[in-house]
């Protein structure tokens, strides 16, 4: 990590903890959020020792198979405690040849073996517009447009204690006038450079749409297709 910090980071480093809860993380075969915390501590320590001001930009995902509403609530609480605010939000979408896609369509965990009886491990899949919108709303807990849905959900979950105007509350009790707008996750990020405390979300392993990396890979793909046609 010291080598990475000293010679291979240009101010920002993107890293993908994906989630804080074991439900979705186990389906992704990802380590727990404690691994990210330890990496962050070493990253910040070595950056200070090198006299550099560098930041981690974490990726998180909404609506991945194996994610419950409680998981998203816990992620939102962790994000607020850590001082992170998502700019654009993208949710999981099934894509070909992905293990998560098999989970999405079957409701079973192929990592544990597929069985139609009680031996099969059932996987909670996030389907339906309202529930998918809810999981996105938890990632953007700071957006006033999401507060009505989050208030309703928190009351249903028996967590009305998280509604209020204190620092320990997730969302305020009052509702300001909003236009109800939502930024499309397919648009480029609204800032040219990530801000401290910012984070990114994704639905696949692809780079953010419109990013320099995405444009570069798209050009390389186009060049390969032209070469094959020739």
Predicted features and spans:
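Conserved non-cysteine loop/helix-boundary elements of the Radical SAM core domain that shape
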Residues: 1-80
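A glycine-rich phosphate-binding loop feature that marks nucleotide/adenosyl-phosphate handling sites
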Residues: 56-63, 91-98, 170-171
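Acidic, low-complexity intrinsically disordered tails
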Residues: 116, 172-230
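Acidic/polar loop patches that form or flank catalytic/metal-binding clefts of enzymes
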Residues: 52-57, 85-91, 162-163
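Amphipathic alpha-helical packing elements
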Residues: 137-180
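C-terminal low-complexity, glycine/proline- and small-hydrophobic-enriched intrinsically disordered tails
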Residues: 72-86, 90-145, 154-155
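A structural motif
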Residues: 9-10, 84, 159
């Amino acid at each position: 990590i010291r080598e990475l910090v000293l010679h291979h980071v240009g101010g920002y480093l993107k890293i993908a903890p994906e989630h804080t809860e074991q439900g979705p993380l186990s389906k992704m075969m990802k380590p727990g959020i404690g691994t990210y915390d330890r990496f962050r501590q070493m990253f910040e320590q070595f950056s200070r020792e090198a006299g550099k001001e560098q930041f981690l930009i974490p990726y998180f995902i909404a609506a991945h198979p194996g994610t419950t509403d409680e998981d998203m609530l816990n992620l939102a609480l962790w994000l607020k405690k850590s001082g992170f605010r998502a700019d654009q939000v993208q949710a999981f979408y099934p894509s070909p040849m992905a293990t998560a896609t098999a989970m999405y369509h079957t409701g079973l965990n192929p990592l544990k073996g597929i069985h139609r009886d009680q031996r099969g491990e059932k996987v909670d899949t996030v389907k339906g517009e309202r529930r998918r919108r809810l999981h996105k709303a938890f990632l953007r807990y700071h957006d006033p447009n999401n507060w009505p849905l989050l208030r309703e959900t928190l009351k249903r979950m028996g967590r009305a204690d998280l509604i209020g105007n204190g620092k320990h509350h997730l969302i305020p009790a009052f509702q300001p006038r909003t236009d109800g707008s939502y930024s499309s996750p397919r648009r480029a990020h609204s800032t040219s450079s990530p801000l401290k405390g910012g984070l990114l979300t994704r639905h696949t392993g692809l780079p953010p749409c419109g990013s320099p990396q995405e444009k570069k890979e798209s050009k390389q793909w186009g060049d390969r297709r032209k070469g094959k046609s020739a």
